Amino acid sequence: IEIISLVFVLFFFFLIGFVDDSIGLSATKKIILYFIITFIFVKLNSRFEIHSLNFYLFETKDIKNISIYFTCFCIISLIIAVDLMDGINLTTSIFLLSKLLIVYFTFEEMIFQKQLILFLIVPLILFLFFNAKGKVYLGTGGTCVLAFFISLIIIDKANNYPNLLSATHILALLL
């Protein structure tokens, strides 16, 4: 169910972005749609839910009561931030590429996921070339899909390696 729901979510995020780029959607409608899609995905895949915040020098803060809402907030915040950066050439692609490279080199033992991350890194590097010349841009559909995917990778790593990534590191990586 995880792969199927991921494909549907990525499709719906791309569809929202495509509609927004084509005819335009209000910010309120987009945020509501982002929340509904993200909420359903996280509810179906609790692996991507942030259950606690691990502060580096302090105690772990349990947020089980609001964890799904906090997770949705983090994911949607990244999507909106990346979408806002898309208007300036190279900004979005360099930002996303840097996040992917950080995750790629931080978690060396995850071979399959490293290949998946490479699957995103290589096209982004090629995209940089054309984006620098102003020939192409990601658009809302591309930024939504990539931002959502990167947020899932970071949340998954944070849940599996709580000592390596504290809550402050997660938020710094996301924003």
Q: What residues fall within each predicted segment?
A:
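N-terminal transmembrane signal-anchor/hairpin module of polytopic inner-membrane proteins
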Residues: I1-F58, D62-I63, F70, N163-L175
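Alpha-helical transmembrane segments
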Residues: I4-L15, A81, L90-L175
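Divalent metal-coordination and catalytic microenvironments
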Residues: D21, D86, T140
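Short, highly charged low-complexity linear segments
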Residues: N45-S52, F73-S77, G134-Y137, A158-P162
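Unusually extended, aromatic-enriched hydrophobic runs near protein termini
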Residues: L53-F70, D86, V122, L128-G134
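Function-critical hydrophobic alpha-helical transmembrane segments in multi-pass membrane proteins
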Residues: I66-V82, I88-T92
